[in-house]
């Protein structure tokens, strides 16, 4: 580009006019706005929200205390303690997730060999104190029991891609 062409581009502010033209084009287009609490957009089956622990159909918890989720968690948000039962199977005595540390990466769900820990599609939860976002085993099992139908439906919808 010659110096004269560069001078005219700078003098006539062509880059500025191109930017204003682009802005003007989008100014009159129809907007897409969702009034959030009343309206909700569909959520992907792969959405990673609140954690839950699942049970088998007979009521026994699925977690076998392999601690893969604890090992793979990059944020170190999962704490597991386990004991051996009388029938020589290992089960968790403590399973805690600190949601203030969790980055919702989904590695815990992917590493679980028995689909015990899942991330639900629940995105509306809060805590007024820091301790409210510290979920214990009983709290996670309660979430899993309450939303088992939705969890199973999301797993079934996503099964073809796994």
Curated annotation (Swiss-Prot):
Cite the binding residues for [4Fe-4S] cluster 1: 63, 66, 69, 112
Q: Which Pfam families match?
A: Fer4_7
Which keywords has UniProt assigned to this entry? 4Fe-4S, Cell inner membrane, Cell membrane, Iron, Iron-sulfur, Membrane, Metal-binding, NAD, Quinone, Repeat, Translocase, Ubiquinone
Q: Where in the cell is it found?
A: Cell inner membrane
Molecular function as annotated in GO: 4 iron, 4 sulfur cluster binding; iron ion binding; NADH:ubiquinone reductase (non-electrogenic) activity; quinone binding
EC number per UniProt: 7.1.1.-
One BP annotation, GO: aerobic respiration
Cofactor (UniProt): [4Fe-4S] cluster
Q: Which free-text remark accompanies the cofactor? A: Binds 2 [4Fe-4S] clusters per subunit.
- Catalytic activity, as annotated: a quinone + NADH + 5 H(+)(in) = a quinol + NAD(+) + 4 H(+)(out)
Domain 4Fe-4S ferredoxin-type, first and last residues per copy: 54-83, 93-122
Which residues does the annotation say bind [4Fe-4S] cluster 2?
73, 102, 105, 108
Concerning Gene3D superfamilies, the annotation shows: 3.30.70.3270
| PROSITE patterns associated with the record | 4FE4S_FER_1, 4FE4S_FER_2
Question: Its membrane topology, per UniProt?
Answer: Peripheral membrane protein
Q: Which family does it belong to?
A: Belongs to the complex I 23 kDa subunit family.
Q: Quote the function comment for this protein.
A: NDH-1 shuttles electrons from NADH, via FMN and iron-sulfur (Fe-S) centers, to quinones in the respiratory chain. The immediate electron acceptor for the enzyme in this species is believed to be ubiquinone. Couples the redox reaction to proton translocation (for every two electrons transferred, four hydrogen ions are translocated across the cytoplasmic membrane), and thus conserves the redox energy in a proton gradient.
Q: How does it assemble?
A: NDH-1 is composed of 14 different subunits. Subunits NuoA, H, J, K, L, M, N constitute the membrane sector of the complex.
Q: What is this protein called?
A: NADH-quinone oxidoreductase subunit I
Q: What gene is it encoded by? A: nuoI
